Each structure stands twice: as structure tokens, then as C-alpha cells.
Amino acid sequence: MFIVGIDVAKRSHEVCMITSDGQTVQRPFSIRNNCTGYNLMLEKIRKHTNIKSQIVFAMESTAHYWLALFTRLRKDGYHVILLNPIQTSAMRDMFIRKIKTDAKDSFIIAELIRFG
């Protein structure tokens, strides 16, 4: 299984992809919050798998910025998990280095799903 963590924002999203055993298969990358960005994200993910049932997307419910991406992924048949920002904040606090970057947040979102 592949877990795609997405840190959503107004203009761009940070995306990270890991396996269910924690291996990073796609280093964090940025996409624009538009159709071109969406297609770029899927293109990078498809390099690792084309099977939708092997992919779990996860993102925070940050303001309303998550809604378009969440809706499009669900419409396209992907499994998407929406997280409360309090959950990711608690997970971030578990790491020794308290670094907050969008790339790190996308990884933490993916890890949160991996750990259940």
C-alpha cells in the first residue's frame, strides 16, 4: 500500500508518498492548487502504481483549501482520509526535532495514517 500525505494550502500543496512500511518512495514535492497540479501529482504517483486500491490519500481539513482536492480525488475513485489539524499537531510533537515545514508536514500526515 502507498500513503500519500498532502499538506494543503491556498495556492499550492506539498505532497509526500510513503509505503505502508515507512519507506519514502516519492520525496516531497509541490503542486499548484489547480488541475495542472492535480495531474502532475497523479503522474508522479503512477510511476509507482496505477492501482487505485493501493493508494490512500490523506490531508488536513485546513480552512476550505482541502475541499476541491478532496472532492476531485473522491470523484476519481481514490480513498481519501481527512484529518483534523489537532491530530497532525500531536504527531509533530512526537518528533524530537520540532521542525515545521510544508514538506515535513506532508510526511507527518502520511506517517499518521501509517501508524493508524
Regions found by a protein language model. Name each.
Residues 1-116:
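Phosphate- and other anionic-substrate recognition elements at nucleic-acid/protein interfaces
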